[in-house]
Amino acid sequence: MPKLRSATSTQGRNMAGARALWRATGMKENDFGKPIIAVVNSFTQFVPGHVHLKDMGQLVAAEIEKFGGVAKEFNTIAVDDGIAMGHGGMLYSLPSRDLIADSVEYMVNAHCADAMVCISNCDKITPGMLMAALRLNIPTVFVSGGPMEAGKTKLSDQIIKLDLVDAMIQGANPNVSDDVSEQIERSACPTCGSCSGMFTANSMNCLTEALGLSLPGNGSCLATHADRKQLFLAAGKQIVELCKRYYEQDDTSVLPRSIATKEAFDNAMSLDIAMGGSTNTVLHLLAAAQEAEVNFTMADIDRLSRVVPCLSKVAPNTQKYHMEDVHRAGGIMAILGELDRAGLLNSQTRTILGMSIGEQIAKYDIKLTQDKAIHKFFRAGPAGIRTTQAFSQDCRWDTVDDDRENGCIRSKEFAYSQDGGLAMLSGNIALDGCIVKTAGVDESILKFSGKAIVFESQEDAVSGILGGKVQAGHVVVIRYEGPKGGPGMQEMLYPTSYLKSMGLGKACALLTDGRFSGGTSGLSIGHCSPEAAAGGLIGVVKDGDIIEIDIPNRRIELMVSEEELAERRAEQDKLGWKPANRQREVSFALKVYGYFATSADKGAVRDKTKI
């Protein structure tokens, strides 16, 4: 029988000092011997996805104590990628993921906590906490803040749905008036919650459902809806149950590594491909798998991307549907149900509810269950009222969307495409692979050949695009923006958005060793590995070189002879694989990150061989 970790600081005369301090936090005599459960919150007023989380920690804590645990809350940092976008702040986004993972480890191990409830929401917070949970391997439940409602506004006598990306694109479009641009800006982000499309934050929160580490509805139920409160309450109750099963019954099946197995990672990646999720999820799943000591690699992603169809298209891949529509269609359990019926899911993996994912689908998939309460839950919809308050409305759709032929979520037979929403490409310019969100690529440019136009930084690329240097037919190459070369692997949402603003969204490709926002669509290929700073061939591309892209055949090639490439490599060896004439201030903290960072194909985690 495993001993409570917290007994280290609560039992024995030699821990009198620690107990005295515990008492000063409010613990009573009968609390010693109960599991101490860390409530890992991420409230901040900087981030709309976290601005409503201030009281969520104590909501969960009260439920933990109601069912027999001792709850202790602490906070992590949280970076808003949208606000950090387009300037030096973006260098800090990806490194913050690892900092969050470390900070959770520090707090939990320093205080000998027995279990965790992780209250996350936005881009790097969920992955950072996920890495920590798999590293620590103590009972853990994830519950996120929930998605934002989609923005809505009236243009040309039509009501259209909006999100953050629309504000970015229209703001840079010279053909859009100031009044219309401001109208879109004011309407794009109406409520608290993670941005309303299938961007990185929502993608990751959905993947925690597929991994089995969060409750059904976690990825899709709106932040503003009263139903979301039940997820927080259920998380508090469930973590106490997991503690009892592990510490009192020696049931190791409740531990994160027992739940998030290789098969569960396959399920999560299959979900990501099926829903056309953010390419950032690839980075984060690779990183989380390493923490779980699971052998999940780019080869697995390639394998799955060749067989899993695209079953759901959500913004930014279409403006018709946002997360509120995914929830109405049955949420993640509905997509997993369609994958299961197509024979594309490992249905025996376990979940925090103590059942298999197959059993969970049978209970929560609206196509399988007649449970009125579950159908009511998935009818939870938007109110269309600007607010920063959680649980502030209880509006419902009249019906669920169970149309699997023409609805938001499709069956395999009626898939948006039989080819999945994400693909891994490889070739001489990306020997270790690169990633493209095929769900966001127009069919007319699935095969593309063009002349390279090379930029040594995102900032230069933005200037080149807005200044008219980039023309139709170009392959925009942005290099030295990888984990090591940035350092920090910036998102390239502004370059991709500005290509659309300039009318080049379907006329150009973009290739980078950096990464993309979950809001990116178009022929945008990221995570090129090895990155330029690690000696990757993207570092030797010159203006005018032909780059051929073939998504159906998963190939990308730099059309330069081996003799010429050898000469260019030798030249870069002498120069140290550094960007030419780039002026960028890099802090000591970022230099440390860059020194240890691996390329994207390894999840941009720290290179353990350097320690």
Swiss-Prot record:
- Keyword Oxidoreductase assigned to the entry: answer is no
An example Gene Ontology molecular-function term: 2 iron, 2 sulfur cluster binding
Q: Which UniProt keywords apply?
A: 2Fe-2S, Amino-acid biosynthesis, Branched-chain amino acid biosynthesis, Iron, Iron-sulfur, Lyase, Magnesium, Metal-binding
Q: Which SUPFAM superfamilies match?
A: IlvD/EDD N-terminal domain-like, LeuD/IlvD-like
Q: Which residues bind Mg(2+)?
A: D81, D123, K124, E491
Tell me the GO BP annotations in alphabetical order. isoleucine biosynthetic process; L-valine biosynthetic process
Q: Does the keyword Iron-sulfur apply?
A: yes
Q: Give the note describing cofactor binding and stoichiometry.
A: Binds 1 [2Fe-2S] cluster per subunit. This cluster acts as a Lewis acid cofactor.
Q: Name one GO cellular component term.
A: cytosol
Superkingdom assignment: Bacteria
Enzymatic reactions: (2R)-2,3-dihydroxy-3-methylbutanoate = 3-methyl-2-oxobutanoate + H2O; (2R,3R)-2,3-dihydroxy-3-methylpentanoate = (S)-3-methyl-2-oxopentanoate + H2O
Q: Which cofactor does it need?
A: [2Fe-2S] cluster; Mg(2+)
Q: What is its EC number?
A: 4.2.1.9
- Coiled-coil ranges per UniProt: none
UniProt-annotated catalytic positions? S517 (proton acceptor)
Pathway linked to the protein:
Amino-acid biosynthesis; L-isoleucine biosynthesis; L-isoleucine from 2-oxobutanoate: step 3/4; Amino-acid biosynthesis; L-valine biosynthesis; L-valine from pyruvate: step 3/4
How is the quaternary structure described?
Homodimer.
- What family does this chain come from, according to its entry? Belongs to the IlvD/Edd family.
| Main function | Functions in the biosynthesis of branched-chain amino acids. Catalyzes the dehydration of (2R,3R)-2,3-dihydroxy-3-methylpentanoate (2,3-dihydroxy-3-methylvalerate) into 2-oxo-3-methylpentanoate (2-oxo-3-methylvalerate) and of (2R)-2,3-dihydroxy-3-methylbutanoate (2,3-dihydroxyisovalerate) into 2-oxo-3-methylbutanoate (2-oxoisovalerate), the penultimate precursor to L-isoleucine and L-valine, respectively.
Q: What is this protein called?
A: Dihydroxy-acid dehydratase
Lineage of the organism: Bacteria, Pseudomonadati, Pseudomonadota, Gammaproteobacteria, Pasteurellales
UniProt gene name: ilvD
